[in-house]
Amino acid sequence: MSGSVDVVTILWERTSLIPLTQRTIVQASVIGSAAPCKNTLDPGDSYRAAVLCLLGNRFVQVLNLDSGLSGVAVFIRLF
């Protein structure tokens, strides 16, 4: 297989069970590169802003686990 794969995993949390409460990043890990979105993946950053950046830069969300107050999302980008 030629080319490379970038993988971003985000652990997020929200402070309330109210569905529209903003989610914040607890931890993010990157395999490969998250450019140009690396600066949106710090703890405390907005999960929504990170997702919009990733999706706008050819990442595809392949997993979204939502337990209400916390969750995990995985994004991949193929070259």
Which stretches of residues belong to each language-model region?
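Terminus-proximal functional modules
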Residues: 1-79
